[in-house]
Amino acid sequence: EAPVGFTPPELDPSTPSPIFGGSTGGLLR
């Protein structure tokens, strides 16, 4: 289940996600 702020690193790994605390790729990998 992907949360509302779920953003794959393929789109923009530099985009700070409020849910991941600004670390998108770190949580997915």
Curated annotation (Swiss-Prot):
Name the GO terms of the biological process aspect. photosynthesis
Q: How does it sit in the membrane?
A: Peripheral membrane protein
Q: Which stretches does the entry tag as region Disordered?
A: 1-29
This one is known as Photosystem I reaction center subunit II
Give a yes or no for keyword Iron in this entry: no
- According to the entry, what is the taxonomic lineage of the organism? Eukaryota, Viridiplantae, Streptophyta, Embryophyta, Tracheophyta
What's the name of its gene? psaD
Q: Which InterPro entries match?
A: PsaD (IPR003685)
Question: GO CC annotations?
Answer: chloroplast thylakoid membrane; photosystem I reaction center
Question: Is Chloroplast one of the keywords?
Answer: yes
Q: Which UniProt keywords apply?
A: Chloroplast, Membrane, Photosynthesis, Photosystem I, Plastid, Thylakoid
Query: Disulphide bridges in this chain?
Result: none
Family statement: Belongs to the PsaD family.
Q: Which domain of life is it from?
A: Eukaryota
Protein's organism: Populus euphratica (Euphrates poplar)
**Location(s), subcellular:** Plastid, Chloroplast thylakoid membrane
What this protein is reported to do is described as: PsaD can form complexes with ferredoxin and ferredoxin-oxidoreductase in photosystem I (PS I) reaction center. PSAD may encode the ferredoxin-docking protein.
